[in-house]
């Protein structure tokens, strides 16, 4: 069974759950209950909200969640936990955006992002999972995979980068591989960011028009756009084989970026029980006396221009 990530409906003006009375009174403008529809291709149920999440409210809630992520990280380090979080989904679904918000306030020495490129010629000859194993966490670490070994079930299969035998072997061995990781003590969490074809097209167009984001779109993205249904079928097959009890797929409705980020982070925090460990108090040592030190003339140094 696929699990959909949800969060309590909050009143954006105050951050508290809406009362039934208030909800009825402001049903049209405030009620964020879900409206379900199918995408054009019919393979996904897309959740539509009646109102966009306000930026001020979003930033306030995000800050709260990021404080909790810091607490979680301290707990992971103190207890020697090993956490792997996989982020999968279509191009422009928002995987990188949520990863960025998760890691913004975390120690990069403890929380690492892994986004592997095309395998080298040597890696192509290795056991398929081998190049991912090198990036698994040690005790006290959390690793976020921006795409993962599931490339084989998606892009590699659809684009013909692997053989049918390699594809079938992946579907057969992946659940056992993940169970092995879990038995070794790794906490494995898997998210699928679900975006509608209409929203993906909108984001692609934005990337094409925006010079700052232009690098985000590639020829492979454009080709995958042509094969939407093929990717949908591949996703369905992947879920059927790898949505296991020990490591289920959690589906995030990603058509609204802000909601997707808050929902995903909130859900992630709910999956790992943690307590707030008060950090050791830090006291700055007294400032040392100059003890005869004389700074060299500034003219001996190369100073960058003060343009701002």
Regions found by a protein language model. Name each.
Residues 8-9, 14-308:
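Glycine-rich phosphate-binding loop of ATP-dependent small-molecule kinases
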């Amino acid at each position: 069974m696929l699990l959909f990530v949800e969060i309590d409906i909050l009143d954006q003006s105050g951050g508290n759950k809406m009362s039934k009375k208030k909800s009825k009174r402001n049903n049209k403008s405030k009620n964020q209950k879900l409206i379900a529809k199918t995408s054009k291709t019919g393979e996904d149920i897309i959740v539509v909200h009646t109102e966009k999440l306000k930026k001020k409210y979003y930033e306030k809630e995000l800050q709260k969640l990021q404080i909790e992520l810091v607490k979680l990280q301290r707990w992971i380090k103190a207890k020697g936990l090993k956490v792997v979080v996989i982020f999968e989904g279509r191009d422009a679904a928002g995987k990188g955006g949520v990863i960025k918000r998760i890691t913004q306030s975390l120690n990069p020495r403890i929380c690492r992002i892994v986004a592997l490129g095309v395998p080298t010629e040597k890696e192509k000859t290795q056991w398929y999972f081998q190049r991912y194993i090198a990036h698994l966490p040690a005790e006290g670490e959390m690793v976020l995979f921006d795409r993962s070994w599931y490339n084989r079930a998606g892009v590699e299969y659809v684009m013909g980068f692997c053989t049918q035998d390699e594809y079938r072997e992946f579907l057969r061995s992946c659940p056992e591989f993940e169970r092995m990781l879990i038995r070794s003590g790794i906490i494995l969490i898997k998210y699928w960011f679900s975006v509608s074809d209409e929203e993906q097209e909108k984001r692609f167009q934005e990337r094409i028009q925006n010079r700052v984001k232009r690098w985000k779109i590639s020829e492979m993205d454009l080709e995958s756009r042509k094969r939407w249904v093929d990717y949908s079928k591949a996703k369905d097959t992947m879920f059927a084989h790898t949505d296991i009890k020990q490591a289920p797929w959690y589906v995030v409705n990603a058509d609204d970026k802000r909601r997707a980020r808050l929902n995903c982070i909130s859900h992630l925090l709910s999956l790992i029980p943690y307590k707030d460990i008060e950090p050791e108090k830090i006291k700055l040592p007294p400032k040392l006396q100059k003890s005869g030190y004389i700074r060299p003339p500034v003219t001996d140094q190369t100073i960058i221009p003060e343009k701002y």
